[in-house]
């Protein structure tokens, strides 16, 4: 069985789940609306340009998780999934997932976005295997710290190698679908790298290396 790996944000989703969580928090005044929105947008631009300081970003993103009760977080997350995520699940993304399921492939999402947000999104997409950045939790509350290696850039390779070892799989016949040049380290590891609605940097690399370029939005 081959491994079909999917990035999440702007690949299977027509938007960025991490950024939209920030928008949700700001719109509902769970955080200071203007300052949080401005900082959230600045980090998103850093991500797009390949300049993101992942540790600074995670400190920013995890602060609301640490400051609020789990019950409040779960209530907000359920509302956010309805308002922000369900409308941006791409039908062609669902079709692609189903294609690989019918082939008998093992399905895996790997995302830099944290597991608090992405666990239910993976469930909505019907994918059981998820590698995401994990926020640390102690005694039922988030601490604001990251647990282990963030699954970002080369960190995706590190986390995937650990997952492969744990599950006794390998990358023979593997696919990886991504929109972002930030995922080049992992795209270079798989047998079939596929650029999905790629950013300019990834599109250029994909053309140079004769990788398949696919749109799930058209």
Regions found by a protein language model. Name each.
Residues 1-49:
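Active-site neighborhood of HAD-like aspartate-dependent phosphohydrolases
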Residues 16, 68, 155:
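Conserved active-site and cofactor/substrate-binding residues in soluble primary-metabolism enzymes
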Residues 22-23, 62, 191:
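Amphipathic alpha-helical segments within well-ordered protein domains
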Residues 44-47, 54-70, 129, 134:
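Short, compositionally biased "basic patch" segments
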